[in-house]
């Protein structure tokens, strides 16, 4: 996307003092020129955060969520909301999902420090053992989503990740 260097380099480290406005203005300018849609993932390092407590506080019924925890490795992550989602069935569902995931990652600039798994854009899945839905009300055999938000705690470091869709009518101020 940055072929003519009109978009400043994304900040590698983000905290509450990081000014993202120049980067966002440049990115939206490029999107307007190209007419394409992009996703954006911003990782912000924070003080202490408890992913499960945050999930419990902001979860709304019907909202896609996920929570994973590995106490032995001091790892926990919670996520919610949908920025992008897809469902797959049939014998090639995993290869189709991989292609979809690669296309999402190709159009997702990453801002901030993404040194741990779970920082930066992270796709979450739900899968059944069946290749096809057995009933009309059954979940699809493979569902994948990019969440709107993620909260990660890893070995004493804490991160909040915000994912969003950017298009020609996006505003860097909102």
Predicted regions and their residues:
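Signature of the chorismate-utilizing enzyme
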Residues: 1-174
């Amino acid at each position: 996307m940055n072929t003519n260097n009109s978009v400043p380099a994304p900040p590698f480290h983000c905290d509450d003092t990081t000014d993202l406005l120049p980067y966002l203005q440049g990115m939206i300018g490029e999107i307007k020129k190209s007419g394409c849609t992009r996703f954006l993932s911003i990782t912000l390092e924070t003080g202490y955060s408890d992913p499960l407590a945050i999930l419990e506080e902001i979860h709304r019924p019907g909202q896609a969520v996920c929570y994973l925890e590995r106490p032995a490795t001091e790892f926990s992550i919670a996520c919610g909301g949908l920025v992008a989602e897809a469902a797959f069935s049939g014998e090639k569902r995993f290869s189709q999902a991989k292609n979809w995931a690669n296309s999402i990652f190709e159009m997702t600039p990453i801002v901030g420090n993404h040194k741990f798994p779970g920082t930066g854009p992270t796709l979450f899945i739900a899968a059944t053992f069946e290749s096809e839905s057995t009933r009309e009300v059954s979940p699809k055999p493979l569902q994948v989503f990019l969440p709107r938000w993620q909260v990660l705690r890893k070995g004493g470091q804490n991160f909040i990740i915000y994912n969003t869709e950017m298009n020609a009518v996006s505003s860097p101020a909102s």
